Amino acid sequence: MVAKLTEQERVEKLQPLLDAGWCLVEGRDAIYKEFLFKDFNQAFSFMTGVALLAEKMNHHPEWFNVYNKLQVTLSTHDVGGLSSQDIRMATYLETQAKLLH
């Protein structure tokens, strides 16, 4: 079963994501990042790849897309905050975004 990140895990695992441009969401235990792509096709292709992992993980991001902009919020609803699944998903998004740029 997935558990909410401990304080130690938050310190160790969140910092690399914060350094990469993710930010903590005010008022809730979640992280957020906005990704910009060349065009809609590139954004949609990125989202499709993320969707495949999300299905395998049974962990789905909250996201909003307009043309080449994708806004992503991650939090684990079952635990009421950030979990290792959010760290894994955010790390995957970072890796995939770097491949496109």
Swiss-Prot record:
A GO molecular-function descriptor: 4-alpha-hydroxytetrahydrobiopterin dehydratase activity
UniProt-listed Pfam families: Pterin_4a (PF01329)
Enzymatic reactions: (4aS,6R)-4a-hydroxy-L-erythro-5,6,7,8-tetrahydrobiopterin = (6R)-L-erythro-6,7-dihydrobiopterin + H2O
Keywords, in A-Z order: Lyase
Disulfide pattern: none
EC number(s) from the headed UniProt entry: 4.2.1.96
Biological process terms in GO annotation: tetrahydrobiopterin biosynthetic process
Record family assignment: Belongs to the pterin-4-alpha-carbinolamine dehydratase family.
NCBIfam families, per database record: PRK00823.1-3
Protein name from the UniProt record: Pterin-4-alpha-carbinolamine dehydratase
Protein's organism: Drosophila virilis
